[in-house]
Regions:
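N-terminal intrinsically disordered/low-complexity leader segments
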Residues: 1-23, 212-215
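An amphipathic alpha-helix adjacent to DNA-recognition modules
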Residues: 22-30, 37, 42-43, 54, ...
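Small-residue (primarily alanine) positions within well-ordered alpha-helices
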Residues: 31-32, 50
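Append "Primarily bacterial transcriptional regulators
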Residues: 44-51, 60
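Hydrophobic alpha-helical connector segments
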Residues: 73, 87-116, 140, 161-171
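Short secondary-structure transition hinges
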Residues: 108-148, 180, 189, 193
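Amphipathic alpha-helical packing segments from all-alpha helical-bundle domains
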Residues: 130-155, 165-169, 194-209
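Amphipathic C-terminal alpha-helical segment
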Residues: 148, 152, 171-190, 206-215
Length: 215
């Protein structure tokens, strides 16, 4: 049985203190991700990060034109980490189908790491990024992996791929809706955590049933 935490847990990324020389760009990304995890994307500022890392106020601008560019880089890193996490969960093969494990891991991540999830899926950074940007590539890699877990069955290659993309989008839309409604307190008060898990199971079953259809 899957259980979800509806309150964000403490991120594994800890805010870094003084910058001790080295890769400032990397230090800024890590510090931004830690701030996002703790207080959300809107809390990130160059001035605060510069004070935290004990560098000049001008130093961040040597690596990023503005805070939006830094947050786009942080979102790219977050997508890469998230994709690796989902693949590791699927590889454990503990219970359920690969698709079910990934779906439950997706929702669990969104509920436990609300700030990071909002940076990835509920901010303008992905929409504003060029289609060939590292951010779009990282986001697309996760979607393609999600698609790979949907069996096209006996359908022809072209028709099967179109159906797989359509079903994957519908499933992700459902999972995203569960995360956002739970995070914003929009689910009915009587809905228990186990019911949320059952809802995810229903979404997965609907996706698997859709992939079994030949029409």
């Amino acid at each position: 049985m899957y259980h979800y935490m509806t309150v964000a847990s403490t991120s594994q990324r800890k805010p870094k203190g003084r910058y001790h020389h080295g890769d400032l760009r990397e230090a800024l990304i890590e510090a931004a991700l830690a701030e996002v995890a703790s207080n959300g994307p809107e809390a990130v500022s160059f001035s605060a990060l510069a004070r935290q890392l004990e560098v000049s106020q001008a130093a961040p601008y040597r690596h990023f034109a503005d805070c939006d560019m830094l947050l786009a880089a942080a979102a790219t890193r977050a997508f890469a980490d998230f994709n690796a996490h989902l693949q590791a969960v699927v590889a454990r093969r503990r219970k359920g189908s690969d698709l079910a494990r990934m779906a439950h891991a997706y929702v669990a991540f969104g509920l436990r790491h609300t700030g990071t999830y909002r940076l990835m899926y509920a901010s303008r950074h992905l929409a504003d990024a060029p289609i060939d940007s590292p951010l779009h590539q990282a986001a697309e890699a996760g979607f393609l992996y999600f698609m790979s877990l949907l069996d096209v069955g006996e359908a022809g290659a072209e028709r099967g791929e179109k159906r797989r993309a359509r079903v994957a989008i519908k499933l992700l839309a459902g999972l995203h809706g569960v995360v956002m409604m739970a995070e914003q307190g929009l689910l009915p008060p009587r809905v228990q955590k186990v019911t949320m898990a059952e809802l995810v199971d229903d979404l997965v079953r609907d996706a698997e049933t859709a992939m079994e259809q030949t029409a």
